[in-house]
């Protein structure tokens, strides 16, 4: 009997060992699968800002010497981004009524040319697309949609003609001019710009920014327009429908030109202010009138990059919330690495590293860093960590 018990004990020990080995094998396969998905599918993006020449170009002008400097600076930036594993660039192609490409609709930015009303022989968007593709990176044309600027900005950038040409669908609010969301001509105007880009450039996507109502929307002067609409729905839903109409018009235009070009946007970082026991006033649905969940559900977006420039309890629960609302579309949390520079912000490099790690494990499809200059110029230690996380 003792011999039988001894054999049973050996079998039991070996069985437990085999189960442990099987568990380790399965876990290893899952990890390997996860790593493969990370390498092949994850969106690792950066916003490359041209407004005020924050990231690029470092110099403005149209002489051959300046143009060559602009090209070399952009090559250097893209080389550095590719080296640390960034695979997606949101290249700011339209700012406030000005563009960084050869357009028949809007003028080239003085941040590129150095002067108003001047056209450069250099086409930055074409160059950015070519150089991104050379590095196996995707390039998305980043469009700032609604704001045109204040009176001083309009004068300084000689946008008075643009303003006058579109005056019937422009609204002055809190000292700033905005394309009017409720006027159908706004949707057509922005769709024409997106269509022009997709028709003339081999971009991988069009990325919409500021596709919302402005701050202090409670005092936004659209009451007469709302009254003329017949007030058939609440003001808030009427506004959301206005933004949705713009998004859908742009989407339809982009896909009609090239179905393979993606449409994405950067909504506000919190979707709905009523979250658990708390209320967050600055949110996409109620403050910006962005009905993002509807856009995703009705297949009018390919992915989103919400601007989640917060940390801790203001970050992680909302990653989960966005993923739950995404209807299977990729969610790419926008990380505010510029916060590391803010006095008294109490941010450190570990925070960004944790946000990337947790985003990957909470169901997100990558991350987007705001912005390129902060990553490449301000935080060399973060640059090293990003490279490590992307390997």
Which residues does each predicted region cover?
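The substrate-binding groove and active-site-proximal loops of carbohydrate-active enzymes
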Residues: 54-68, 107-121, 174-188, 232-243, ...
């Amino acid at each position: 009997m003792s011999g039988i018990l001894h054999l049973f004990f050996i079998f039991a020990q070996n069985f437990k060992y085999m189960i442990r080995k099987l568990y380790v094998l399965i876990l290893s396969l899952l990890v390997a699968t996860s790593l493969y998905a990370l390498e092949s599918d994850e969106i690792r993006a950066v916003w490359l800002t041209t407004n005020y020449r924050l990231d690029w170009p470092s110099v403005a002008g149209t002489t051959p010497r300046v143009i060559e400097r602009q090209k070399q600076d952009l090559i250097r930036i893209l080389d550095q981004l590719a080296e640390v594993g960034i695979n997606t660039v949101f290249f700011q192609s339209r700012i406030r009524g000005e563009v960084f490409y050869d357009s028949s609709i809007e003028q080239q930015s003085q941040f590129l040319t150095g002067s108003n009303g001047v056209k450069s022989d250099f086409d930055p968007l074409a160059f950015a697309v070519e150089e991104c593709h050379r590095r196996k990176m995707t390039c998305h044309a980043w469009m700032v949609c609604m704001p045109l600027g204040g009176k001083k900005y309009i004068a300084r950038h000689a946008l008075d003609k643009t303003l006058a040409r579109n005056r019937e669908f422009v609204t002055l609010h809190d000292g700033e001019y905005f394309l009017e969301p409720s006027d159908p001509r706004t949707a057509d105007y922005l769709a024409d710009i997106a269509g022009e880009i997709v028709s003339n450039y081999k971009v991988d996507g069009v990325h919409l920014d500021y596709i919302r109502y402005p701050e202090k929307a409670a005092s936004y002067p659209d009451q007469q327009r709302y009254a003329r609409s017949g007030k058939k729905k609440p003001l808030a839903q009427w506004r959301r429908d206005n933004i949705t109409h713009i998004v859908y018009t742009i989407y339809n235009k982009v896909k009609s030109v090239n179905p393979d070009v993606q449409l994405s946007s950067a909504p506000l970082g919190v979707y709905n202010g009523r979250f658990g026991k708390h209320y967050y006033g600055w949110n996409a649905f109620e403050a910006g009138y962005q009905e993002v969940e509807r856009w995703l559900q009705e297949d009018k977006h390919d992915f989103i990059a919400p601007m989640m420039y917060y940390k801790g309890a203001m970050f992680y629960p909302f990653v989960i919330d966005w993923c739950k609302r995404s209807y299977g579309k990729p969610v790419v949390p926008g990380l505010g690495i510029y916060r590391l520079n803010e006095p008294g912000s109490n941010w450190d490099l570990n925070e960004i590293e944790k946000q990337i790690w947790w985003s990957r494990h909470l169901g997100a499809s990558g991350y987007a860093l705001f912005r390129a200059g902060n990553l490449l110029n301000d935080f060399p230690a973060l640059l090293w960590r990003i490279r490590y996380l992307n390997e």
